[in-house]
Structures are given as C-alpha cells and as structure tokens.
C-alpha cells in the first residue's frame, strides 16, 4: 500500500521503508509529548491537591468572577483569607490553576527566590512592554540583573537628599491651588486627582530636571502618562485584549500607541539634549555644574552608569528605565498618600498627634520646609503612614511564575510553571498575621510592638530580590507631602464612604473625596 501511494511521485518500493520509519518516529515523538504532558499534569495535580480551594462557580468557569476588582471583590478576598489563611487554589476555567498565597510565613520561599527562579508572570507584564520597553518592571534574567545593579546608585541617599527640596516645592504648589479652591467656596477635593498631579510634577523634575507646571496648566506629556495608565488598567480587566493583534485594531489600542509616541518622543528628546551637553562640557565640567545645583537627576545617573565591564546603558535602555520610573513612581505614591490622608481624616486623634509632631519639629523655622534630616524625626507620622500602607496597600497583588518547583515551609510544593499570586492585600488583612486587621491602628508599628513580627508581614513595596527599588524615594515624598499638608490643613471625611477599586493600584470608585479646611495662621 505504501508503495502504491508513493508511485505517483515517481518513487519506487526502495524508498518506502524510510518513509515508514519517519512516520513511526513522528508518531512516537507525538505520543511521547502527549505522555510527558499527561505525566506533568498528573504530577502538578498531586502537588496542587495540597492546596484548599473554595467551591467553583461551575466546572466550565471555575472560579472566574468570584474575586472582582471592586469593593465587593475585596470583601470576598478578605473572607477567603479568613477561611484559608495560608493560601488557596483557584481555577481560571477548567484548565488553568492559580495559587494565591496570603500568609507571611508561606510567601518567604517565593519572595526570597532568585529573580531567575521566580519570574514575573509575563502574560500581564507583556502589555506594558510597548510603553516601558525592557525596564526593570518588565525585564527578566541577565538584563534585569545588570540594570538593577546599575540603577541602585540612583537611589542612594546622596542622590535623594536634594529631591526633598523638589518635594517641598511641588507640595507647596498643590496647597496654593487648594487655598484658591477653598477661597472660592469649594473645600471638597478628590485626593487622587490632586496628589497624582503633584507626584507627576515632582517626578518630572527629579527624572528630567523639567518643570512643565502640570499642576497649573495642561501638559501633553503628563496627559499622555495619565491616559496610558488608565488604558493599561482598563486592558488588564479585559483578557481578550491581551492579544496585541486584536487590541491594536481597537480605538483604545490606537490611543495607546499615540500616547506611547508622545511619551517616547519626550524622553528621547531629553536624552539627545544631554548627549549634546556632555561632549560640549566634558564629563568633569558636567559633574561640577551639577554639583553647584546639588542635584543629579535620574537621566544624569543613567547616562553616567557603567557596568562591571565599563559598558554604558544604551539610549533605548535609558528611555525604558526613565519611562518605567515615571509610571511606577506616580501612581503608587499617589495611591499611598491619598489613602493616608483618608485614614487620618477618619481618625482626627491621630491626625492631631501627627500635626503636633510636625509643628514641634518646625517650630521657629522659616520658611516652613521639610529637610532630609527631618524625615527621621517624625516617628509617629511614619507609623501612621505604614499603618495606612498596610490597610490600603497601593499594589494589592504581585504575580510570579516559577521556572522550577518551589518547596514551601509547610512542605507543600508549588509546581514549575504554575501562576502564583502573592496577595499583599491578603497578607495585610490576614487575622492570623495581624489581629483585628480591619482596624486602623498606627501603634502596630511602634518599634516595641513590631520587633517580633515577621519582616514579610508588611510588604507594600514587595520584598526579596525584586522589591521596589524606589521605596526610599516614595517614603520620603509621602512624608514631606503629609507633614506640610497637616501643618496647613485639617482633613475631614466626606459624607459618602469611598468604595475601594483595586486596578493596577488601589483606587476609589469615582475618586477619593475629602473635605479640606485651612488652619488659621495662629494654629501652626
């Protein structure tokens, strides 16, 4: 039969045997692959069997739609954490398992694993790549390790010290705007709107040494960043839109590409200008001129960075890291600070104690300005910030997909290739980690109370090798802005309680509104 089937090609019986052999080899290879997949699925099932799972909606949907990015979804997550305090297994449809870990003792193995073992889940982070390139947030492997080492000096306290002046100035601009709005009779303000512009204003000055005056007038670059952030958050909730081919055809996809072009052109123009400046001045003269102003911006540090072999970052790498810092630095800090203001508005006794601490620190000082050394002199204000970051973490979850099996401290195993969610919100709201977790209590972070706690019980900036490289920058900015705000204004809760909305960062549906009253001159 095989001879006849080949005769029309002009091939005789003598070539039939090799074809039979090839067909047999091909069939054997396919069968082997199927058996390997079956064995892997069986092996994974055995490991996954050790993780409890809530009842599925049905066999087809699995647990899809149980924990939604809404206030109700966070309440459901809180219920699940109370029921399964170590973590639980959920299914996306009938075939895709996702493990959620929500206890500080359990997440240690994942967070402390090397960046090469515990990779970020590429499915989500890939949608950021057209905007952020291979910056620290998106990259992996050797490239990530090299960039992390080269960027670490950018966040040394000697670099950060002069930024405190910028934080003061940007906060002053925001407060001047508040005073005008209040004098016009409007004292009800959306904290997210105002604080986001303030953090973008600071970042643009710290990253590019560029003042767009974005808090007072519109800026194409700032508008593009805000639009990109909104589009990414929207796309994150639409799994079908993860396919680039489909997304690029939609109106949102077209707006995304247009906004990317605006951001990239701005960053590229700054880099080109710095390259022109460096040859004209020479490196020594350039550093001397910067020393006079006492400020090296982020672009300067990236341009001057060299790895162990003396190689510099490419312009493409510099753009990716600058764009990443603008993205990561504004939304997370704005979320953190907005919720801090909200929590202090709801707890006037803590607000007043923070205010007195700031007043005592700045007594007799003109102008009223926070300096770098002051940041360590605000212990109660720092406790209030940390407790707010626990109760309302800006980033509620991080995802990992491990390249090898991960053994957990309790003996269970997370199989290679399984998506693992580390629920920062879940850990922070876990009653077996934090007693009465829904209560805002800054004294949890009193040095005497916190000393025996697990270092992984509080991870608003993640932890381990891939922790947030800019956490000192963020904490410094929040301290400055909060201290000056409490010095000048009284914060009061709005009549309507906000509904939390976990997107890329923790927001509030329709904004986070507070009432703001200026303090009399004699009050501070």
Swiss-Prot record:
Q: What class of enzyme is it?
A: oxidoreductase
The family database entries (Pfam families) matched by this protein are listed as: p450 (PF00067)
**Membrane topology type, per the record?**
Peripheral membrane protein
Native organism is: Mus musculus (Mouse)
Recorded catalytic activity of this chain's protein: leukotriene B4 + reduced [NADPH--hemoprotein reductase] + O2 = 20-hydroxy-leukotriene B4 + oxidized [NADPH--hemoprotein reductase] + H2O + H(+)
**Under the GO molecular function aspect, what terms does this record hold?**
heme binding; iron ion binding; leukotriene-B4 20-monooxygenase activity
Q: What is its EC number?
A: 1.14.14.94
* Keyword check for Protein transport: no
Query: So which residues are the signal peptide here?
Result: none
Record's protein name: Leukotriene-B4 omega-hydroxylase 3
Query: What's the stated role of this polypeptide?
Result: Cytochromes P450 are a group of heme-thiolate monooxygenases. Catalyzes the omega-hydroxylation of LTB4.
Could you give one GO CC term from the UniProt record? endoplasmic reticulum membrane
């Amino acid at each position: 039969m095989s001879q006849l089937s080949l005769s029309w090609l002009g091939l005789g019986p003598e070539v039939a045997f090799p074809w039979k052999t090839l067909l047999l080899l091909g069939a054997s290879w396919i069968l082997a692959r199927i058996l390997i997949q079956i064995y892997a699925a069986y092996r994974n099932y055995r490991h996954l069997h050790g993780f409890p799972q809530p009842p599925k909606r049905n066999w087809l949907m699995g647990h899809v739609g149980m924990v939604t990015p809404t206030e109700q979804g966070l309440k459901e997550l809180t219920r699940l954490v109370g029921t399964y305090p170590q973590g639980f297994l959920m299914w996306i449809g009938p075939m895709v398992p996702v493990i959620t870990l929500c206890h500080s003792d359990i997440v240690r193995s994942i967070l402390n694993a090397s960046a090469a073992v515990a990779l970020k889940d590429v499915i989500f982070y890939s949608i950021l790549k057209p905007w952020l390139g291979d910056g620290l947030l998106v990259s992996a492997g050797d490239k990530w390790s090299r960039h992390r080492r080269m960027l670490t000096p950018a966040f040394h306290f000697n670099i950060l010290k002069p930024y405190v002046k910028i934080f003061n100035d940007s906060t002053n601009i925001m407060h001047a705007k508040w005073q005008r709005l209040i004098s016009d009779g409007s004292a009800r303000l959306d904290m997210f709107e105002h604080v986001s512009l303030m953090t973008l204003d600071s970042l643009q000055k710290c990253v590019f040494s560029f003042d767009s005056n974005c808090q007072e007038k519109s800026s194409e670059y700032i508008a593009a960043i805000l639009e990109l952030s909104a589009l990414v958050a929207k796309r994150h909730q639409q799994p079908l839109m993860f396919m680039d081919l489909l997304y690029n055809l939609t109106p949102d996809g077209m707006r995304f590409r247009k906004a990317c072009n605006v951001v990239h052109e701005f960053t590229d123009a700054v880099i080109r200008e710095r390259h022109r400046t460096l040859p004209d001045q020479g490196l020594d003269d350039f550093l001397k001129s910067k020393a006079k102003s006492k400020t090296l911006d982020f672009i300067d540090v990236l341009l001057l960075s060299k790895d162990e072999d003396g190689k510099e970052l490419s312009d493409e790498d510099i753009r990716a890291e600058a764009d990443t810092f603008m993205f990561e630095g504004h939304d997370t800090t704005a979320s953190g600070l907005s919720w801090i203001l909200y929590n202090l508005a709801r707890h006037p006794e803590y607000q007043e104690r923070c205010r007195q601490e700031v007043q005592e620190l700045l007594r007799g000082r003109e102008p009223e300005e926070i300096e770098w050394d002051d940041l360590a002199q605000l212990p109660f204000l720092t406790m209030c910030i940390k407790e707010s970051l626990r109760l309302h973490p800006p980033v509620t979850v991080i995802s990992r997909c491990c390249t090898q099996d991960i053994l957990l401290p309790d003996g269970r195993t997370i199989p290679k290739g399984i998506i693992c969610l580390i629920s920062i919100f879940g850990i922070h709201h876990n009653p077996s980690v934090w007693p009465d977790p829904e209560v805002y209590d800054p004294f949890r972070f009193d040095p005497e109370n916190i000393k025996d706690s697990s270092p992984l019980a509080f991870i608003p900036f993640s932890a381990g090798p891939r922790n947030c490289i800019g956490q000192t920058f963020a904490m410094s900015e929040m301290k400055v802005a909060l201290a000056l705000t409490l010095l000048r204004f009284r914060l009061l809760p709005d009549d309507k309680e906000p509904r939390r909305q976990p997107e890329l960062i923790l927001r509030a549906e329709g904004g986070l509104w507070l009432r703001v009253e200026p303090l009399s001159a004699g009050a501070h």
